[in-house]
Amino acid sequence: MASIERAGAARRAADQAGARGPGGPSPDRARRLWFKRYPAAQTAAAFALALLATAALSIDPSNATYEAIQKIDPTATGALYICYEVLLSFAGHEQAVMLLALAILLTLPIRYAVFGRRGLFRPSVVLPAAAFAACMVFGKSYDLTDSAQLAIGGISRCIESLIAGAGWAVLASTGIFLLFECFDWFGAHRLRFSESSHGRLWRAADALLNRHPFAVPLAVIALTWAPTLLAAAPGLFMGDTGAQIRQWFNLPNGTSDYLNLIDPDVLLNGHHPVAHTALVGGCVQLGLAVFGDENAGLMIYTLLQFAVTASCAAYLVSTLRRLGAGLVARAAVLAFFVFVPMFSNYAVLVTKDVLFGDAVVLLAVQMAKLLLPPVDPGSAAGEVALDIQTSPATGLRIAAVPVRLPFTARDWALTAAAALGAAFFRNGGVVFPLAACVLAAAWCLLDAQRGSRDARRVCRRAAAGALAVAVVTVAAYLAFSKVLMPALGITPGSRREMLSIPFQQTARYALKHDGAHAGVDGGTDDGTVGEEERAAIDRVLGYGDLAERYDPDKSDDVKNGFDEDASSEDLAAYFGVWLRQLLSDPACYVSAVANNYFGYFYPSQRDVWVYGTASSDELMARDDNRAYFDFHRADGALNSLCDHAVSLYRVAVQRIPLLSLTMSSSVYVWALILVSVYLLRARQWRALSLLVPLWGVLAVCLIGPCNGSTYMRYLYPMICALPFAVVVCLSYPRRLWRG
């Protein structure tokens, strides 16, 4: 009992000492600063900044047409014409009431950030705010016109962009400043629940997330995802699913047609991860052998993936409890997985990205446990847990005492499984467990420099274990890709997969300067591309229809023209041309990259691509699939009812304002950026290490083929792991923060 009282007193003292949070005011002082009486001049200045911010939201360059200006002033030219263009780009009275109301609402937070507190002009606020403003201005232009024309296409456009950028910068700097203050507060306070103040709500939340931290979240996730499973049974096809299954059965498929096969009799190849192809194909083969039905085999795979994905999400939530995260944070993470339709949709989608995402989630969770610093100099490296003591009569928590548990054999097994899954379910994915294990080992070795002899020994063992997982994973990957695959005649993937950026740049340059020779009727020919340059490009990409194949948002059509027989000399000649064209028109090359990836930083007006039952049915019915298999969706009344309900809910989330942001890649990318900046300014290197795998996923997206405006599949692993990383890094108690 005395130990419990000492623990409670220590906790209260820690709460009082951290009430202000690192760099933030106390709640009472913040409230006074928000609502105190400011000088009229400061309030007026804040209102003016709020008007500027709302003006940024209302600018629409398409309103300023030549006809509209002619009706006002037919003789307008020069500077006068530019002024008309700028003024007509504003919304006018059409949205005046809404924008005025928004400006009034924004006045209070802007006044508080500018005049009530210091720190608004710190680099950690100003730099991300400026980057956000630039992304909003240029992102809108690329989203609407596939170019920077709306942002810098003339003097009037530049003026409009400066106004819009200034407004977005005001919004962003205020928002980032307040967000960082919220991070400070959440890091110092636990939102507490009690039966007296919350009644049944407290009992339900406690039963859900405390008494059964894994089983109940797993049941909740499985139950809420079940309608999607029933609607999609036996599983959702996407573009690559049929090709992977045909590969396993050694049947013709799109990838084996263009590769130079090392064994013409073996059509299985490394365009898709061979391990995942074997898993999907093996399940289909099992269904045919046992049930005589390929759909039964597909259902086996879907159920397996569904179970693994739901279990990883539940394990993530349960681990947050063991790491000391509060009830509200854990409930929010669980609700995120339950209510965002992307997760249930992907859980039944037959694609490599889902199991790779599960591996990344598991890797992040295990990495967090290894990264935990010692609670005291004599503590062992491993997992921090809460020793919950309860009263049998009331079920109320008496005390929560921080204790330290060893990194168990089960934890090492999960770490190895996560590392192997990341390495084998994504081509090139071996870099993720390698980076995670090396970082974890480095921190364990650093912790081994202090503490008791036993603590140092445990830290060294943890470091050795992390390095052993890395070595085993890399060795297994190399043995599989360099020994087993050649021995079985399995051809590796193409070199073209890593060349999306230069290929897109070349195609855009050809469209802009030499479209007449690159497949565009009536295209340009300004003489900047000579015959030798065309020939050098043709030997690698095929020049005759290069510009016609160019899609600003997706590089697949351009990459598909890659000649697998191109020699090293051909590639060297091509990159020589690429460099000369870069120097000739660098803006074109920058636009090619911006156009292909702006959706990761700008909330596009386009709806993200959803893998629904309608598109799956079309893919199942394609001739190249129908020729060998009879895949089809279950057509029962319950399946149809679930399909309608799931589709309706998904559309609602996509279209309802604010909720629709959960279906935008840019929201998650900016969340990762801002959390990283916050940790960087606090110099929390240990916590930043946990975000390295997530940054790795984003980096892969930014050299990949697709735009985040319409494809979230490539970012899915980062989205899955982000809630866990954010809660562990920022919430009370901050286990990964240095003392």
Task: Name what the model sees in each region.
Residues 300-324:
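Transmembrane-helix motifs of polytopic, lipid-linked glycan transferases
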Residues 231-238, 251-309:
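Membrane-proximal lumenal/periplasmic loop motifs of glycosylation machinery
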Residues 487-637:
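Membrane-proximal stem/loop segments at transmembrane-domain junctions that anchor or position
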Residues 42-62, 128-141, 211-238, 471-483:
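Transmembrane signal-anchor helices characteristic of membrane glycosylation enzymes that use polyprenol
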Residues 170, 174, 249, 355-378, ...:
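Specific aromatic-rich, kink-prone transmembrane helix
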Residues 78-101, 296-300, 595-694:
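Membrane-interface anchor segments at the N-terminal boundary of transmembrane helices
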Residues 411-426, 472:
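Membrane-interface alpha helices of multi-pass inner-membrane proteins
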Residues 122-125, 129, 214-216, 316-339, ...:
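Transmembrane-helix signature of polytopic, membrane-embedded enzymes
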